Amino acid sequence: MVRISVLNDALKSMFNAEKRGKRQVMIRPSSKVIIKFLIVMQKHGYIGEFEYVDDHRSGKIVVELNGRLNKCGVISPRFDVGVKEIEGWTARLLPSRQFGYIVLTTSAGIMDHEEARRKNVGGKVLGFFY
């Protein structure tokens, strides 16, 4: 299998395990972007605890699933989004206004679209989950 995007592979394996009713999933290889994305998901309660396992290669992440994740995905290419354009992206990607999050990478770090709007920063779209 050819790895196009490590983040895409991680989110797809989580989504597939969630659909199958699994309680946990192992993601490998890991990266800092995946860990930050998982922190945003955990902050909003879409996943449980996760643990980084160092295997002296690229590392693994074991994620506890709690059954709240309906869909997650990566937006490729990573489009530039200004603060005023965030509303349009949420309307395009999410099922409703109060449901789900878009994850952005900004100059202030990786965060969801609501936090980016509060801090008044734009960035690049990484992905979404709901």
UniProtKB/Swiss-Prot annotation:
GO terms for biological process: translation. InterPro entries: Ribosomal_uS8, Ribosomal_uS8_CS, Ribosomal_uS8_sf. GO terms for molecular function: structural constituent of ribosome. Transmembrane segments: none annotated. Keywords: Cytoplasm, Ribonucleoprotein, Ribosomal protein. NCBIfam families: PRK04034.1. This is Small ribosomal subunit protein uS8. It comes from Brassica napus. The gene is RPS15A.
